[in-house]
Structures are given as structure tokens and as C-alpha cells.
């Protein structure tokens, strides 16, 4: 797929006024037909000094995006037979290439009309003022964002979907705006070796989303497409919604610095969010941090040639998370239509769905973190870096939990459980070689994190529905353990039970004549009986592994030779357990194809590594593998045209 991008920008100004304007156009073709995007971006920024004490500025940006039409079905394309006929003799598309209705033509709806356009306008303003008190200043920032989105689709009679419904139309209109207003009062003074930097913040945010949707089928003809929704004679639907949120914040932060040796920061922040319960909208989040710049001490002067900088850091702080949708504290009704009276009159009504119950006691999720770190630099910054150790404890997690259906509902958003994260992060920067014309620098990063669930609902029980287990990571794969592949006439011992193939019943039975694994046959995945009862049940599921890696590493290199620059990055992920999509054969065996080159089990190839192509996994289990991999990415080669050549053309840099 090709991508075309063009951009024009202009900037300039005087000592009092600066400006920048730009316009860009992007046309990106999609890999799949009708999946491209066209984007136009216009921006303008201007800053003006009004005397020596006041500076104001404004920035505007307008973006329009136009998306492709109806995307061809990739899944239907993958499941098609290579012998299928995609077109009729007259050149029109066939609905079903193999004369059966299991897998439609991937382009069966390609002739549908689609218009998807979004427009976004962002306006930001600021004012910086120096107040009459020495060291005191004030800044206010205001940002407004408006986004409109329109989607119109019409499936005419020349499409598979539209032909069955005599035309099908849908339009969606969405209007969203938000604004953020920040006011900062700053005080910065030095008194001898003492330096104080204080900031007070007042912030207000508000969001508003209005959305409406119409759909219908059975139109007289296709001429009006989605522009005449009143013409729909069947399946008319109307939907609309309004979502509003607001957030109010106060913050006070004081930084103290003595002789650049001893540093102390104390912060207090209060946040209020409209979506929480009436008595829990506000929460207070304090933090404190201290640092000791040892390299500034007099007793370290003798090491200055080797140890350029050494700083110890220690901090404790808390922050909040308001990651819930609006109105989760309220009961949320859904609309329905029912027949009333002897004549069966259609009447609109409302009901409380299983997941629509509100929780008026919802409150902020809080994370408290302790961090200890060290910053260092050697040999005049030829080698530098930092090491951080941290422990984070999160309480009152905002999660949807299941409850007994006898309550009339089966899930509710709640503050449940506690989690703990701890780990280490290391960054090293080095200048490996440096001469007049040549420089080679490297950056190494290492990160290790261990997380676990400390508590769920306070009763010591795990949550199997959400796959949350006390003492285990939050994101895990919970499934049956695959020991291998069932073979013909297989027989093995496990947990004191003897499992063998019964040719008469064509089943694998235990010594009591019970089926060990329902539906298993030669070529099926062999599952492990974890609880030792001699048969496979849901109780045999186990934690296969974590979805997050044990640790990650990266190594970046930048090489400069005169005006040439070459850079590349190695990124490594280690100890992550991933679902093996190419092993999940049921997703492929629905069609006429299978993955070429895979070592499938067959009677002639009784491998123990993979199952047969037609195997349908028991209880929808899947396959996993613990993986380590290293990627080479972000390879860049650049050349800076010498300034002596550019200056003749009036160009600053190229």
C-alpha cells in the first residue's frame, strides 16, 4: 500500500511576535480494499509579548479524516476454497463462490455506499504574567476540543446484505467537546544557598458527548441511499445518548533545594470526579520526595575526574484512577418493546438489564508507590544512567465483578481487591567512541516487573469468571494444560489412573470405563488431569502463564560520521506466555484451507507436537507457548546537507 504525505509550513516573527502556520495532506492506501484514510491538517500558532510582564498566545488546529468504504471480509477470504468462482459469467460478483451459504464472497458487500468522516478542531490559549511580587508569576491555560463524526452506510440491492433486505441503511452522528482550564500560581526565589519553588494549581475539565443513530431496511429503491431514512419500511430503530463528565482539581507543590545537595519535594493534590458516588467524588493524594546529590559534597572532590555525578533518590506518593464510565453509580435502564392488550398493541417500555445495576458507593482507585533510585555519571558523562526500584500497592480497584444471579443481576461495578507491583528499571547511556568526525553512542534499558493480586473481595476466594487469582498476576492465561497429542492405541499412566484407547467405543477410557476426555480421538490435544479424578473437567484448568513478560531489554545505537547519521534499535521481550493462533486449527478448519508448512498430526505423521487440522478444541481450550524474542527495529539513515551549501539558498537546515 502506498502512502503520500505533503506538508507546507511557514514561521517567523519579531522580538515581540512569533508565528507558525502549516498545512499537511495525507493519503494512505489500505492493505485491504477500501481501508485507506485521507487526512488534512491545518494549524496556526501565534505568541505575542505585551510589555515586559505579559505574554499571551493562541494555537488552533483543524483536522479532517475521511475513511475508506465497506471493508472486504478477511475471514471469508481466508476460508474460501481456491476452486471457488468469485464472478458470474456476466462479470457480477457471486454471493457464494462454492454454491453453499457457509462462506460468502469476501466482496459480497463491496458495492455498498459508505461515508465516514470526522472533523476535529482544537483551540488552545495561554497567558503568562509576572506579578509585582518578586519571584511570583501566574499562568492560565485554556484548551477547547471539538469533534464531529458522521457515518453513513447503505447496502443496496447489488450487495448480499442489501438484496436480502431490499436495501439496508444506517447513519450515525456524533458530537463531542471538552475543555480544560488550568490556572497556575508560581513562586520562585533564592535566599543564599536556599532555593524555593512553589506551585499552586486549580484545574477544571468538562466533557460532553451527544450521539444519535438511525437504521432501517426495506426501501422502495436504492436511489436515496441513506439520505432518506424515513423511507425505511421495516426494522426502524432510533437511538440517542448524552454523556457528560466533569473533574475539578487542586494542587500545591513545594520544591526546596539547598546548595544543589539536598532536595525535597512535598505535594498535595485533591481531585473530584462527577462519575463517583455523592459522598466519594473527592479524594486527596499526597506525595513526598527527597534526593541527596552526593557528588556535590566536599569529600567527593577527589573523585570528580572519575565520578561526575552521583545522586540518591527516595519518594513516596499516591495517585488516583477514575477509570469508570459515566453513570456507573446509577441504575441504567434499557428500552424494549412489548405487546399490550388483546389487540397486541406495541408499547415501548424499560427494564433493568443484568449489568445495569448502579453502585452509589463507587470511589477512587488509589495507588501508593515507594521508589528508591540512584543517578550516576562517570568519566565526564561518557557513561551515565539511573537505577530505580519501586513497590506499588493499589487498593479499591475499579472492576466489574460477578454476583449471584438470584439478586436479579449478574455483575456490578465495584471497588474490589488490592494488587501489588514491584520491580526494577535500569537505564545506561554510553559514548563508546568519540573523535573529531566520528561518534558512536548507545542506550541500554532493562525493566523487570512482578505484579500479583493481594486481595479480591476479602473472602479469600478467587474469581474464576474474570480469571483473577490471589497471589498471581492480574493478567494470566487460565486454561487446560496440553501434554501432547493423542495417538492411535495410546495408553499412559497419570495420577494413579490408567488411560487407554478403546477401539470398540472409539474413546479414551480410564480403568473404570469412564471417558477420560470427551470427544478425544487420535490427533486431538491430550489434556492433563490436574485434580486426579481420572477425567477431564473444568476443575483441571490451571494458570498456564502470565500475559506480561518476565523482563524486557532494549539496546539503541546512534552512529555519526561527519554529516551522516545511522541509528538502530534492538528490542527484546523475555518470558512472556502467548496464545499460539496458528495452533488453533478450529479457526481454519471451518473452510477449505489449512496453513501450509505446519507439522499437523496425521495417521502417517503421528507427531506429538501438533494436532490434526480438523481438531475442534475441547471446551474451547487453546494452545500457548512461553516465548523470548528480539526485534531489530527503527533503522534510520540520514544525511545533513552542509550549512555552507544551504546558506546560499537561504535554508537553515535540511
Report residues per predicted region.
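Surface-exposed loop/turn segments flanking beta-strands in extracellular/periplasmic regions
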Residues: 76-107, 152-169, 210-238, 329-357, ...
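Extracytoplasmic gating/loop element in the C-terminal half of outer-membrane beta-barrel translocons
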Residues: 81, 100-102, 231-232, 273, ...
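Outer-membrane beta-barrel transmembrane strands
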Residues: 2-15, 24-26, 106-153, 171-190, ...
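Outer-membrane beta-barrel signature, preferentially recognizing the C-terminal barrel domain
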Residues: 103-113, 120, 231-251, 340-384, ...
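Flexible loop and strand-edge segments within Gram-negative outer membrane beta-barrel domains
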Residues: 3-24, 28-35, 41-120, 159-176, ...
Amino acid at each position: 500500500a502506498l502512502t503520500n504525505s505533503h506538508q507546507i509550513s511557514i514561521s517567523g516573527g519579531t522580538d515581540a511576535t512569533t508565528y507558525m502556520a502549516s498545512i499537511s495532506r495525507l493519503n494512505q492506501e489500505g492493505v485491504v480494499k477500501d481501508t485507506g484514510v485521507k487526512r488534512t491538517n491545518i494549524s496556526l500558532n501565534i505568541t505575542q509579548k505585551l510589555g515586559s510582564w505579559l505574554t499571551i498566545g493562541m494555537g488552533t488546529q483543524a483536522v479532517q479524516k475521511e475513511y475508506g468504504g465497506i471493508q472486504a471480509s478477511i475471514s471469508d477470504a481466508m476460508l474460501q476454497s481456491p476452486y471457488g468462482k468469485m464472478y458470474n459469467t456476466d462479470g457480477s460478483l457471486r454471493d457464494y463462490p462454492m454454491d453453499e451459504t457457509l462462506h460468502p464472497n469476501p466482496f459480497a458487500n463491496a458495492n455498498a455506499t459508505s461515508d465516514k468522516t470526522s472533523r476535529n478542531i482544537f483551540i488552545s490559549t495561554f497567558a503568562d504574567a509576572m506579578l509585582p511580587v518578586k519571584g511570583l508569576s501566574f499562568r492560565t491555560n485554556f484548551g477547547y476540543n471539538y469533534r464531529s463524526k458522521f457515518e453513513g452506510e447503505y447496502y443496496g440491492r447489488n450487495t448480499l446484505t442489501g438484496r436480502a433486505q431490499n436495501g439496508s441503511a444506517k447513519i450515525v452522528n456524533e458530537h463531542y467537546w471538552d475543555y480544560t482550564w488550568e490556572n497556575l500560581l508560581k513562586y520562585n526565589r533564592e535566599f543564599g544557598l536556599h532555593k524555593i519553588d512553589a506551585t499552586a494549581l486549580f484545574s477544571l475539565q468538562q466533557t460532553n458527548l451527544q450521539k444519535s443513530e438511525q437504521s432501517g431496511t426495506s426501501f422502495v429503491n436504492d436511489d436515496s441511499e441513506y439520505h432518506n431514512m424515513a423511507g425505511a419500511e421495516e426494522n426502524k430503530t432510533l437511538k440517542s445518548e448524552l454523556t457528560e463528565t466533569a473533574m475539578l482539581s487542586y494542587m500545591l507543590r513545594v520544591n526546596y533545594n539547598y546548595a544543589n545537595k539536598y532536595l525535597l519535594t512535598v505535594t498535595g493534590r485533591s481531585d473530584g470526579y462527577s462519575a463517583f458516588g455523592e459522598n466519594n467524588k473527592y479524594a486527596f493524594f499526597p506525595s513526598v520526595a527527597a534526593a541527596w546529590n552526593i557528588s556535590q559534597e566536599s569529600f567527593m572532590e577527589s573523585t570528580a575526574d572519575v565520578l561526575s555525578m552521583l545522586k540518591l533518590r527516595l519518594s513516596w506518593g499516591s495517585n488516583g484512577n477514575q477509570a469508570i464510565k459515566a453513570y456507573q453509580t446509577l441504575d441504567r435502564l434499557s428500552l424494549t418493546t412489548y405487546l399490550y392488550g388483546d389487540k397486541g398493541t406495541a408499547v415501548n417500555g424499560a427494564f433493568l438489564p443484568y449489568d445495569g445495576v448502579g453502585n452509589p458507593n463507587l470511589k477512587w482507585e488509589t495507588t501508593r508507590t515507594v521508589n528508591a533510585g540512584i543517578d550516576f555519571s562517570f568519566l565526564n558523562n561518557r557513561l551515565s544512567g539511573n537505577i530505580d526500584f519501586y513497590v506499588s500497592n493499589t487498593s479499591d480497584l475499579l472492576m466489574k465483578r460477578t454476583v449471584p444471579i438470584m439478586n436479579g443481576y449478574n455483575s456490578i461495578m465495584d471497588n474490589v481487591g488490592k494488587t501489588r507491583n514491584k520491580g526494577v528499571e535500569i537505564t545506561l547511556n554510553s559514548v563508546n567512541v568519540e573523535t573529531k568526525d566520528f561518534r558512536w553512542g548507545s542506550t541500554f534499558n532493562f525493566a523487570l516487573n512482578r505484579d500479583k493480586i493481594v486481595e479480591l473481595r476479602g473472602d479469600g476466594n478467587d474469581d474464576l469468571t474474570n480469571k483473577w487469582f490471589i497471589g498471581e498476576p492480574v493478567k494470566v492465561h487460565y486454561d487446560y494444560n496440553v501434554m501432547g497429542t493423542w495417538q492411535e492405541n495410546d495408553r499412559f499412566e497419570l495420577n494413579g489412573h490408567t488411560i487407554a484407547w478403546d477401539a470398540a467405543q472409539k474413546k479414551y477410557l480410564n480403568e473404570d470405563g469412564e471417558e477420560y476426555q470427551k470427544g478425544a480421538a487420535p490427533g486431538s490435544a491430550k489434556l492433563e488431569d490436574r485434580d486426579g479424578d481420572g477425567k477431564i473437567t473444568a476443575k483441571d484448568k490451571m494458570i498456564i502463564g502470565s500475559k506480561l513478560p518476565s523482563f524486557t531489554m532494549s539496546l539503541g545505537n546512534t552512529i555519526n560520521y561527519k554529516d551522516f547519521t545511522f541509528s538502530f534499535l534492538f528490542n527484546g521481550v523475555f518470558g512472556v506466555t502467548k496464545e499460539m493462533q496458528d495452533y488453533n486449527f478450529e479457526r481454519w478448519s471451518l473452510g477449505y484451507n489449512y496453513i501450509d508448512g505446519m507439522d499437523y498430526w496425521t495417521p502417517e505423521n503421528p507427531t506429538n507436537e501438533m494436532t490434526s487440522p480438523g481438531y475442534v478444541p475441547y471446551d474451547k481450550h487453546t494452545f500457548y507457548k512461553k516465548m523470548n524474542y528480539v526485534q531489530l527495529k527503527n533503522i534510520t539513515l540520514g544525511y545533513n546537507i552542509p550549512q555552507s551549501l544551504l546558506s546560499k539558498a537561504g535554508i537553515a537546515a535540511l
